[in-house]
From Swiss-Prot:
Localization (cell): Cytoplasm
Regions crossing the membrane: none
Activity modulation: Inhibited by acetazolamide.
UniProt record similarity statement: Belongs to the alpha-carbonic anhydrase family.
Catalytic activity: hydrogencarbonate + H(+) = CO2 + H2O; urea = cyanamide + H2O
Cofactor(s) listed in the protein's UniProt record: Zn(2+)
Domain Alpha-carbonic anhydrase per the UniProt entry, residue ranges: 1-235
InterPro entries: CA_dom, CA_dom_sf, Carbonic_anhydrase_a-class, Carbonic_anhydrase_a-class_CS
Catalytic residues (UniProt): H40
GO CC field: cytoplasm
Protein name stated in the entry: Carbonic anhydrase 1
Amino acid sequence: GNKQSPVDIKSSEVKHDTSLKPFSVSYNPASAKEIINVGHSFHVNFEDDSQSVLKGGPLSDNYRLSQFHFHWGKTDDYGSEHTVDGAKFSAELHLVHWNSGKYPNIADSVSKADGLAIVAVFLKVGQANPKLQKVLDALSAVKTKGKKASFTNFDPSTLLPPSLDYWTYSGSLTHPPLHESVTWLICKDSISISSEQLAQFRSLLSNAEGEAAVPILHNNRPPQPLKGRTVKASF
């Protein structure tokens, strides 16, 4: 495809777009539903209700939060998917939303050009981040593929950086089926995670219970060619 993700954001080629508005999120902590080990990562899934919404920025419709997940790597210095001027980050958070203004459900929107919007946040190894603790504490309940556990009363906007300056471009899911249906909003500022916290991601297993243990050491896709696309900056 010609619109694959992730990409390397080259600041010298980014276009500052004065028409880009800030984006806003409003998440209902009670909408958080469950945490599940999907074999290549874990997802925190949200109830399908209109309580948790992303709007503004480059988007012309309201987008509803479906789930969030992380990408990480074998080492602390490279676990992100997107890179900035070639610089890598320790991990990357993806908050996945679907276009509820236009489509009836996420299954219908996942293959549409304007179907999904993903907010990405870089994590940089450093201080332990107490805001990640509730998520990390839940991982022991979903050690193996297919396991799920209740996970509620959590507002993922607490994981966003203080500044919501962002880059945006048209791209794809970074895991099969790789649909080219994503408007990406990538926060310029990162949040912190400690080396010990990162290690907890890698302790998750990609195998089902009772099978030989295979840890999920990395699940980050390398940057893909831009192929003529423009990355715009809100700042």
